[in-house]
């Protein structure tokens, strides 16, 4: 593949470079030969990796950071009217664009495979990427998460395909140019952007119809809202699902060994013995989306099946942080919507039937907690024990949401029938409580999009230390 070009642009400055989507685009630009600088309020592993790749990153926002940039890129999380770097760039006449516009430009000379949906985007995008790489297709890839298989969030390939996670937040995906558009799931989310479900549905329909006449839309018919969009499509489409009749379906699903084995039925053909090494029925559904993409681009079914078998998961997507000989498991997952929490708890319950499930959930955003407290409580109630942490505010402020705390979720879980439910605002107290819970055949399931991941890492480290001490004593 020739180097990506953006006219005479060579120096790109990224405001908020440490965010999942922004760090991925920074990584892609660096690997494509651009000089990248950036700024972020936080530091950490992602920032360290970008520096290793050659990025110049400043902690905090300062006007002088924009320097000799040819363009300044920012995300939906940044307020352009008050950010000093954006204001400085505008004063200097430097173009200022949003992340999705930059991504759309990078896609211009590629055949885009864009995976959208309120759930499963990251996993499905990574499955498609793994499948294409295993088939020797050499795609360019950009995912809003970290894959050990990809050794990061991006791949710059020589092939014609570009596999992209298409984010619906702030209507970002409407800047993309898909040749294949995957509608993986759809339900109420990001109402701060859309206001109504009708608006969200309209936006997904607009995204799907951006596919050219020679492209295809891949639709999950297990989601009622996607079934409502299908009659509005003016492009060819393939359907997939488990619960509903579809062009591509899964049957004979057998969970076990941390994953699932199942049969794919596609356009009248049967493909038994498909193996997926990540747990959960929701991941079987994600695999069907990838299978449908593979068929559309002409991959032999055996190559598709081999690629799916090689998929090993994403960081923070049912990621095993600790596995003890006594059956103790520590899992870290990004689930932060009731549907995701329900699917993740079910995956734990189905995959480890003999284990006691201890769910540790950190609500993300006051607005989301206020809207979905009841649904979160019900989703968590299938666990044997539930711990709810304090809300991770992200871009929101507590004073704007009086009375909204994690206790709402805890109380909803009790109402849904959970017997052992605790709300603990402070992480130190929560860590101490979890240490008391540690016992053989216990699965600790940490869920949330905030800093609960750090608590999962600390608890996993404590489990490792306890095991080492026990081994030393025994010897």
UniProtKB/Swiss-Prot annotation:
Molecular-function annotations in GO: ATP binding; UDP-N-acetylmuramate-L-alanine ligase activity
Enzyme Commission (EC) number: 6.3.2.8
Matches recorded under Pfam families: Mur_ligase, Mur_ligase_C, Mur_ligase_M
Catalytic activity: UDP-N-acetyl-alpha-D-muramate + L-alanine + ATP = UDP-N-acetyl-alpha-D-muramoyl-L-alanine + ADP + phosphate + H(+)
Keyword match Metal-binding: no
Keyword Cell division: yes
Subcellular location: Cytoplasm
Disulphide bonds in the chain: none
UniProt keyword list: ATP-binding, Cell cycle, Cell division, Cell shape, Cell wall biogenesis/degradation, Cytoplasm, Ligase, Nucleotide-binding, Peptidoglycan synthesis
Pathway: Cell wall biogenesis; peptidoglycan biosynthesis
Superkingdom in the source lineage: Bacteria
Similarity annotation: Belongs to the MurCDEF family.
Protein name: UDP-N-acetylmuramate--L-alanine ligase
Species whose genome carries this gene: Chlorobaculum tepidum (strain ATCC 49652 / DSM 12025 / NBRC 103806 / TLS) (Chlorobium tepidum)
């Amino acid at each position: 593949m020739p180097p990506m070009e953006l006219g005479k642009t060579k120096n790109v400055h990224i405001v908020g470079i440490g965010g999942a989507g922004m760090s991925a685009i920074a990584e892609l630009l660096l690997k494509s030969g651009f000089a990248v600088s950036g700024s972020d309020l936080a530091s950490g592993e992602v920032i360290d990796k970008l520096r290793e790749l050659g990025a110049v990153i400043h902690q905090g926002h300062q006007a002088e950071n924009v320097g000799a940039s040819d363009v300044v890129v920012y995300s939906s999380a940044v307020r352009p009217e008050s950010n000093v770097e954006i204001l400085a760039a505008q004063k200097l006449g430097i173009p200022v664009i949003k992340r999705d516009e930059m991504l759309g430009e990078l896609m211009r000379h590629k055949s885009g495979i864009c995976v959208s949906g309120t759930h499963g985007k990251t996993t499905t995008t990574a499955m498609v990427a793994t499948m294409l790489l295993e088939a020797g297709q050499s795609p360019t890839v950009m995912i809003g998460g970290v894959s050990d298989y990809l050794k990061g969030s991006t791949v710059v390939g020589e092939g014609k395909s570009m596999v992209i996670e298409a984010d619906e937040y702030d209507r970002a995906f409407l800047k993309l140019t898909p040749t294949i558009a995957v509608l993986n799931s759809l339900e109420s989310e990001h109402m701060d952007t859309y206001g109504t479900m009708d608006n969200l549905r309209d936006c997904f329909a607009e995204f799907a119809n951006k596919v050219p006449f020679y492209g295809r839309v891949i639709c999950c018919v297990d989601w009622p809202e996607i079934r409502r969009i299908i009659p509005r499509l003016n492009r060819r489409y393939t359907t997939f699902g488990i619960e509903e009749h579809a062009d591509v379906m899964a049957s004979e699903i057998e969970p076990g060994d941390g994953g699932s084995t199942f049969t794919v039925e596609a356009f009248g053909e049967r493909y038994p013995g498909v193996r997926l090494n990540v747990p959960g029925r929701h991941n079987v559904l994600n695999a069907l989306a990838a299978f449908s993409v593979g068929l559309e681009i002409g991959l032999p079914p055996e190559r598709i099946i081999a690629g799916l078998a090689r998929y090993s998961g994403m960081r923070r997507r049912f990621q095993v942080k600790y596995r003890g000989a006594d059956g103790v498991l520590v899992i870290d997952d990004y689930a932060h919507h009731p549907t995701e929490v329900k699917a993740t708890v079910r995956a734990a319950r189905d995959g480890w039937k003999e284990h006691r499930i201890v769910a540790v959930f950190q609500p993300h955003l006051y607005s989301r907690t206020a809207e979905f407290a009841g649904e979160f409580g019900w989703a968590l109630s299938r666990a044997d024990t539930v711990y709810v942490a304090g809300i991770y505010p992200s871009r929101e402020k507590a004073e704007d949401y009086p009375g909204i705390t994690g206790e709402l979720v805890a109380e909803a879980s009790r109402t849904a029938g959970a017997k052992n439910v605790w709300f603990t605002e402070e992480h130190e107290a929560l860590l101490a409580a979890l240490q008391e819970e540690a016992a053989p055949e216990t699965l600790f399931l940490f869920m949330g999009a905030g800093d609960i991941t750090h608590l999962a890492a600390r608890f996993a480290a404590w489990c490792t230390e306890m095991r080492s001490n026990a081994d030393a004593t025994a010897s």
